């Protein structure tokens, strides 16, 4: 799944097995290391961000395909909450993940709310003064993560700036656990979830606060969106479906997950023009 193999190692595996070799890199572009996979003889490269697919395919002519992340229903499903669970996990807003500088700066904007940030303790060099009361300094995994997501009124999923067009694994895990997912908007969301019915996206800090204020007191509406999100995640976004599609693509029966339609400006000799990423083949037109 990650870029651990040297090009010569990929070539040797291919030679010894006689079978196709593929890589599914389930991380954003800032965590691609040395990009060694671009120099290795992979038969297929799968990425979760359609931006990476479009660049590597269009500019490098690499055999790249879109394969979004997903959920594991064995771990990501609604769980029953005991009274002690509710006392421990309940809050207005929660999230789970590494407390990096981007997330620390982001959550300063939510200092007025009851917030719990689950994850490893922050690094010693990080100033967390403004969000200290939010930091739980404890990772939650599997059933504990499901409890944290379901017990909170809102699960805020602020995406890394390096998630250019796609979304992260929590964007699937949160709704799968029947949590209310308030996620950073990205161009690829609309193809994966119905915004406003299965998840809710926000465009900036002001939009985030506006939607937090709107949804916090509206429990019935939140629960309805969370239930619809769970149904969609379990129906369309599981590892079984992703692996089936990956194998079909490797053996020529499919071409990865359909790319979203994204309009953007591109420079030309005459200035700029609007182009669209084609859903069927990933080409620009």
Where are these regions (language model features)?
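Nucleotide-sugar donor-binding catalytic core of glycosyltransferases
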Residues: 1-9, 36, 40-195, 253, ...
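C-terminal amphipathic helix plus adjacent low-complexity
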Residues: 211-285
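Conserved acidic donor-binding segment of nucleotide-sugar-dependent glycosyltransferases
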Residues: 199-205, 215-219
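Catalytic phosphate/metal-binding cores of nucleic-acid and nucleotide-processing enzymes, i.e., regions
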Residues: 208
């Amino acid at each position: 799944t990650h870029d651990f193999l040297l090009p010569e190692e990929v070539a040797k595996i291919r030679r010894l097995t006689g079978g196709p070799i593929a890589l599914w890199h389930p991380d954003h572009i800032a965590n691609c290391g040395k990009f060694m996979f671009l120099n290795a003889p992979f038969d297929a490269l799968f990425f979760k961000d359609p931006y990476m697919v479009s660049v590597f395919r269009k500019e490098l002519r690499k055999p790249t395909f879109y394969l979004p992340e997903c959920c594991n229903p064995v771990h990501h499903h609604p769980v029953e909450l005991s009274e002690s669970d509710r006392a421990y996990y309940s809050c207005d807003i929660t999230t789970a993940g590494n407390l990096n500088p981007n997330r620390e700066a982001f959550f300063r904007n939510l200092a007025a709310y009851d917030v719990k940030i689950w994850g490893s303790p922050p690094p010693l060099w990080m100033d967390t003064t403004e969000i200290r009361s939010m930091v739980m300094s404890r990772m939650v995994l599997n059933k504990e993560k499901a409890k944290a997501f379901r017990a909170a009124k809102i699960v805020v999923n602020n995406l890394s700036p390096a998630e250019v067009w796609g979304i992260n694994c929590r964007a699937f895990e949160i709704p799968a656990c029947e949590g209310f997912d308030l996620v950073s908007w990205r161009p690829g969301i609309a193809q994966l979830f119905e915004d406003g019915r299965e998840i809710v996206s926000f465009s900036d800090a002001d939009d985030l606060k506006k939607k937090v204020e709107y949804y916090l007191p509206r429990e019935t509406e939140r629960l309805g969106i969370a239930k619809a999100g769970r149904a969609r995640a379990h129906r369309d976004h599981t590892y079984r479906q992703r692996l089936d599609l990956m194998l079909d693509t490797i053996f020529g029966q499919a071409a990865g997950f359909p790319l979203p339609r994204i309009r953007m400006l591109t420079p030309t000799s005459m200035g700029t023009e609007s182009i669209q990423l084609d859903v069927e083949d990933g080409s620009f037109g």
